[in-house]
Amino acid sequence: MSDFDSYAADSELEDFVVDDEPPVDNSNNPQNPQDESNEASETRDRIRDLTTALQPNETPTQKLLKAHISVLVTALGGPDHVGSLKDSSSEYKLGHDALACLKDIKRWIKSVDEIGHKYDVALACADCGLVENDLTVMLCQWDSQQKHSNTSKRTTEKIMLSALEILVLLTWPVEMSSEMSENQQLNFVAVRKSQLVYKKHILSYNNGQTFKAVLRLALPTISKDTSDREPRDNAILGLVLFFIRNMLYIEPPSLSTSSKLRKTMMEIDNLPANMRYDDVSINTVLSCFKRNKVLLFLLTMCGSLGSDFDRETFAPCCLECIFLIVRGVEARDLVDNVRPVPETNDANGNNLPTLSSTSDMALQDLLKEEKRRKKVQSQNISTRHGRFGTLLSLQGENSSYVVSGQEALSSANQTFAQLDKSKKWNDRKHFKYDSDAFVNTTPNFITSTTISLLKEFINEFLVGGCFNSLMSSVGWIFSGASDLSYINEYEKASYFLTTAWFFAYKRARIEILKNRILNENEDTLDYGSVAAGLSEVNFVLIIGYVRESFERHYWDSLHVAMICFREMLLISNSVFESKHKDTNSEQDEEDRDMAEGIIRKLFSLEQFVNLITHIPQSASKHSPEYLSVCVSVVYILLKSFENFSKEDIKLYVQSKRKQRRNAKNFKNVDSLELKDIIEGSDEEIDEETVKQVSRERKFDFNKTEMKFFQSSIVTAHIDFLSRYEDLTHEQIKQCLVYFHRLFIVRKDYSGLFRLDFLHVLNSLRDFLPRKSNIRNHVEEFTFHFMKRFKNLFRRFPNPVELLFPRMEDESLRTYLSLGEVVEKPIKKAKEREIRYAKELEFTRSNFSEDEKYKILVSAIYFEDNEKFLSWLIEELSRIVEIAEKDSEASTIKLQVQGEYEPLVLENATVRFLLENVGFVVPESSSDECTCTVGTSELTQSLEYIKKWLSVQPVAFDEDKDASHYLRVRDDANDGEFNIGYDENEDEIAFETAPTNRYREDLEALDNLEELEARISSSNGVKGVARKKRRPKGKISDTKHRSKPSSTHRKPRNLGVHSDDEEDKPLKSGEYVHDSDDESDNEDARAFFEREEKLRRMLTESGGIVNPQQLEEFKRAWGKIVGGEAVDNVLSTLGLQTGASQSSLPLASQSQVDSQPQIDSQPQIDSELQSQSLSQVVEDGPSVESTQESSSEEFLSADEELPARKKRRVIDDSDEE
């Protein structure tokens, strides 16, 4: 066999194209032409297979798309190896249609990846090496050749902008979410790895010259004036910012944990081949940014927002860049120059090289953790029996336990702990990691070089006012939104986390560098450089953000909000702690005002204070980081309350005051006091009201502090302390302070009598090192706790209460803690006042019995009282059955009990139905409902009720309602019945209609309207008509029915009316009826006659100038009222004629004569007109002048008349 035959038999070479065998003469053996065609088709199929072979999970469409993208990338350009033989590196040559190729690639990305929700084009570009071999090479070469003349400069810039746009699209961050399509989920890991390759190449290629080329594209736009910029210029700046943001955002994903396998860590190869974490770490990024002036560009953009750059366009992206730079960096590390020398020994004491990379620093942390765990383990097994096997048997009466392991011999606690490990817990507590999406829980390991670089950048960022400019711009955008829910959650988280980080940085810097001398170019040691974060707008935003996140259960956002809220509290708390150290500085007074302002703004709303007390109650259900933030917030709040109580600082919260409807304060108010209310100025403030409001709105520190010691919050602290192995000593101390305040300061002993707390406290004491300071605090608290616990444990039922959650009743807590029984006074429930209904009648008297029952049953049915009708049928059936069995039975009664008793007393339709049946309806709850008809009438009524109830709903003529055929009896207005008014209603029903009266009458209407408004705001006066309230089911008389009036009074019509116009009836006349309505005409005539006599006396006598004359005048007036003639009284009155007549508010006689007498005028108008004359004369006190007498009528004996209450009196000159 030939060599060719041997290779052809190899199956691995089947896909290779090989030369055919030499032609053989087949003349002697002719073959069928069909066989030749089959051989040719087999050859063609083999070639097609070579070109259309698919990769795993690849479709023919993807294969074709990759081929198309490959053609475009090839046509874009490439290295010119021929034209650059003399150079060491080849020059990149653009293709003839390079710009068109870039635009086509952009269209493919937009149409397939973005619109189609796929990653096919992005993966095709990655396979073709578009970013590494073309885009970055083009940009860097263009930046290097900027000094050379270029004839097609404009075209080249367009190509570079297109290259930048594709770079932004290919490096746009991707995040795994449930909204991703199946294609995106399948290719997510591949796309993320390709982005890491892009980031490494961009940072390393020519020392990151790509950034310098990108910034060069933005320089023409920056140099332009704001008014000269076009939308295209803003788009270029946006592309540059997005490219910087993408490079900061792309990071290797952390290790993922499977939720199904609790003990197995699912490790994924997160990095591409030939890549380390140091290649894309924050250290490499910041050093590259520093070399290529990216940080300077960010300072320029952030510092000029609002002035040179549109803040709504660029502020969010600038904020995100700053947030990504400082995320995961400990703020105190940038301030503390004296850093401790890192430990460079492993767990075995071997020396390690100097830390110079991120991986080395991560390894150092792992070795520290290993060393700590070995130390803890060695404490438990370091016994003299450590080298021998251990088997401990515990024998009981009915059972035995065997414990194995060396830890069981060290102490009794370890023995019990070993027993607990062998048990299987069915009720396991697991944290829900649903609150850490925006919080970077894994810290960034930054080197000393990066620390100095970042410290310099942050200093310039604060000194240049960039922080205030950036935060003011973003805050302006957020505050301008109608609702924070319309803003992206990630943008809100970036804003508040950045604010919190700079607060922590400033607080640490002031704390560490307070006594040091600073350079001129360093940031000052105050909070002026972060003033935008302490502005009024930011406090409104943080309060709204906390409320929205808690109400919508956005735990990730709430975690962010609590971090920012904690930093604000820490700033206020740090000021009070430092105040006692240096009280002579003027800066301390400003800091004190600022600290008070923070608390005042945060706790200005009562709803927010209540919200803060609810958040820690559910904190133990979420991640440990979120629980840690909530515990620290509670600790700082309690400390702040203590500081404010010591400083005697008073806070006031805004709360909705309850309007107390108390009409009894106005029952005994006479008309003069009502007039004083009308004439009093609105600007006057009642001191008692101010004191009451101050007491209601004063922030009670003790009351608010008590809300933080509920059982759920105590449980959250116990759960947090149970993870003591992962806590720092500072966090353990915070929990101890909380328990100390609860148990010792507040003496709430039963709050900590819990088995879980006893177990945690015992385990914590054994875990802490013996020589540590925190262990001394734990032992001291344990001593006081057990001392009290032993005494109370002997008292029943404390041993039982240990097994169950504590009941929050105050009397039970007092009994468990002190053994005292507190008897609460039993509050008697107020009996509801019965409101009796009016009597009804039919609109026509010729209704038949059948029609009457049809109307009544339908009316009750439409009042949703169908159950009453069913009950009535049962009762009537029972009564008829009893009457038929015992015809000589005594009076038959309707047994009205339970829920139907109020209907019989208060529902007019029900009472009318019972009357038609033949019952005597009760007038009170003690009366009985007796029957006055015979058995035959009851049987007939029962049949009517059954008949019409079974066919409900019933239609009437012309679609009328059943209530249309019922009305209130004419004599039903007398007596104390329920007419639909409520004395406690805030509004008055009657309105005044314009009449053909003079100006004096219009002023009286003004007084009346003002009186109504005052009474309405003061919860009303008894006897004044109120707004009509028609309860459901009440049927009123049709002729007494009026249109419902609106809540607001209609504007009074002051137009001129003709004499022939009819006056509109007063609405109050429909409801207000007094006992002397029929004698209104006689009373009005007598009133005007008496008024005329009084005016005549005052005019002829010359007025009243001293108290003696006033007494004589009052005696004379009494004689006139008694019926004596006016002339006789004037002759005997010893008053001087011709005295001053301008001291009393009198009107001319012509006005009185010309006043028309309106018979329908309500009595309240007459009282308002007469009180300025008659009542002043009859009840006026002894004063020096008449003017003072009329003014002091409205004041108490020891009250002074304010200047604003003195009203101008009406003299003769006002008559016109």
Swiss-Prot record:
Listed Low complexity bias regions: 1139-1151, 1165-1194
Segments for region (Disordered): 1-45, 1018-1082, 1139-1216
Primary localisation category: nucleus
Keywords in alphabetical order: Cell cycle, DNA damage, DNA repair, DNA replication inhibitor, Meiosis, Nucleus
Subcellular localization: Nucleus
Biased segments, Polar residues type: 26-35, 1152-1164
Biased composition (Basic residues): 1024-1033, 1040-1052
Comp. bias intervals (Acidic residues): 11-23
Bias-annotated ranges (Basic and acidic residues): 1064-1074
One Gene Ontology term from the biological process aspect of the record: DNA replication checkpoint signaling
Family of the protein in this entry: Belongs to the timeless family.
Protein's job: Forms a fork protection complex (FPC) with CSM3 and which is required for chromosome segregation during meiosis and DNA damage repair. FPC coordinates leading and lagging strand synthesis and moves with the replication fork. FPC stabilizes replication forks in a configuration that is recognized by replication checkpoint sensors.
Name of the molecule in the record: Topoisomerase 1-associated factor 1
Taxon lineage: Eukaryota, Fungi, Dikarya, Ascomycota, Saccharomycotina
